[in-house]
């Protein structure tokens, strides 16, 4: 047992009910002799969560110290949708499905710690990945004095065999398929699924088809395209085909469309915040459709200057989320600017879904800046005087003409 003076008295553990966090729960009890409070979040990962309650009770956790919460609506409304207002993608392609879930889990752990008087929080992220950073930046960003326990960095176990031995010694149930090495590691929520490690660690080898759990193969998707209409209000999707939906219900529906048509697969070799490159197989079916649709309604409603500035800000915004700085002032500053840009982002977008692709085929908005009267190739009846373009071009060409004159006189250095 650790030094009694520094040992936590009560710990809020992010608990899935799986083997690893069940081992962590028992390790906390054995190592520190502390009281453990479990928090299990329903983020739309598609798993039955009540077994987590039974496992926690079997491990000696008091009933009043077991928190199982459905946070799907909060997750989509307060985290996913704000991120999609920014069109955020990391390194050009990754829709940040794992990254965006961590701030909410950290927030609820801190809130529960305050509620029950816990002096520490604990997560099950390994010492090699990004999640340890995301969780802990979240904890400290919300409670600067909280004690953080990261078992994968602290305990003495050297191998999976050591973990399984500890589990057996303490009566922790081990599923038969967990006795050997699992083929890959999975994280899932309502926005996406990610698979990493083991059979995926050679980036030259194609990922086995069985890794993909959220989407059919594009080759096996229907031969008939499907057309849907997504409605937006102030940057957030609010309806599909005219049917109003809550944020989580809408994303669930888009996931079903994306799954059916094989949309949202990504094989990415990404740069982790901790310094190494890692390979991830991501599936973000509904999010991929939503991103294309949101950019489509912005095409009609955002001014060029605002749209281009927003695109310049996006990589920084995405990097902040990827690295775990959701609760930072710079993310909040960027969010304020992004949200301000969405005041007029209202209207309908028509999408065609077909064999792995989400095509934007139409958009309309009462606040559209598109003027058919001005842009027409036919007679615009004086709406736009083409002669004005000559002066516009001359003024913009002035510095280029001066540079060209010098180059022609003295040659280019």
Curated annotation (Swiss-Prot):
GO terms for molecular function: argininosuccinate synthase activity; ATP binding. ATP binds at residues 14-22, 41, 124. Keywords: Amino-acid biosynthesis, Arginine biosynthesis, ATP-binding, Cytoplasm, Ligase, Nucleotide-binding. It is found in: Cytoplasm. The keyword Phosphoprotein does not apply. Its EC number is 6.3.4.5. Pathway: Amino-acid biosynthesis; L-arginine biosynthesis; L-arginine from L-ornithine and carbamoyl phosphate: step 2/3. It catalyses: L-citrulline + L-aspartate + ATP = 2-(N(omega)-L-arginino)succinate + AMP + diphosphate + H(+). CDD domains: ASS. One of its GO terms (biological process) is L-arginine biosynthetic process. The keyword Transmembrane helix does not apply. Pfam families: Arginosuc_syn_C (PF20979), Arginosuc_synth (PF00764). PROSITE patterns: ARGININOSUCCIN_SYN_1 (PS00564), ARGININOSUCCIN_SYN_2 (PS00565). Homotetramer. Belongs to the argininosuccinate synthase family. Type 1 subfamily. This is Argininosuccinate synthase. It comes from Hyphomonas neptunium (strain ATCC 15444).
């Amino acid at each position: 047992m650790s030094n009694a003076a520094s040992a936590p008295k009560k710990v809020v553990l992010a608990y899935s009910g799986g083997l690893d966090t069940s081992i962590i729960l028992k390790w906390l009890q054995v190592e520190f002799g502390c009281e453990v409070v479990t928090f299990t979040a329903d983020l739309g990962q598609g798993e039955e969560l009540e077994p987590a309650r039974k496992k926690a009770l079997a491990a000696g956790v008091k009933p009043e110290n077991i928190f199982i919460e459905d946070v799907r609506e909060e997750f989509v409304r307060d985290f996913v949708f704000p991120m999609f207002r920014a069109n955020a993608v990391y390194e050009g392609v990754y829709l940040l499905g794992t990254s965006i879930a961590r701030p909410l889990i950290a927030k609820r752990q801190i809130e529960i710690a305050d509620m029950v008087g816990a002096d520490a929080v604990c997560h099950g992220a390994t010492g090699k990945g990004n999640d340890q950073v995301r969780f802990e930046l979240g904890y400290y960003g919300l409670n600067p004095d909280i004690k953080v326990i990261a078992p994968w960095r602290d305990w003495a176990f050297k191998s999976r065999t050591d973990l399984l031995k500890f589990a057996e010694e303490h009566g922790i149930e081990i599923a038969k398929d967990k006795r050997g090495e699992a083929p890959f590691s999975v994280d899932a929520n309502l926005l996406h699924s990610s698979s990493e490690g083991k059979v995926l660690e050679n980036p030259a080898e194609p990922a086995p088809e069985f890794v993909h759990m959220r989407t059919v193969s594009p080759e096996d998707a229907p031969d008939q395209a499907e057309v849907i209409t997504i409605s937006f209000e102030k940057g957030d999707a609010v309806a599909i085909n005219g049917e109003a939906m809550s944020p989580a219900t809408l994303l669930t529906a888009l996931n079903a469309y994306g799954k059916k048509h094989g949309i949202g697969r990504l094989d990415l070799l990404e740069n982790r915040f901790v310094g190494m490159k890692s390979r991830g197989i991501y599936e973000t079916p509904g999010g991929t459709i939503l991103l294309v649709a949101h950019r489509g309604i912005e095409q009609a409603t955002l001014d060029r200057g605002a749209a281009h500035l927003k695109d310049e800000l996006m990589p920084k915004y995405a990097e902040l989320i990827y690295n775990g700085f959701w609760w930072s002032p710079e993310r909040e500053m960027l969010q304020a600017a992004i949200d301000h840009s969405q005041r007029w982002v209202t209207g309908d977008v028509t999408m065609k879904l077909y064999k792995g692709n989400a095509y934007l085929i139409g958009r309309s908005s009462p606040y559209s800046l598109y003027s058919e009267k001005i842009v027409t190739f036919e007679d615009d009846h004086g709406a736009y005087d083409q002669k004005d373009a000559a002066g516009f071009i001359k003024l913009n060409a002035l510095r280029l003409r001066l540079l060209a004159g010098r180059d022609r006189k003295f040659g280019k250095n």
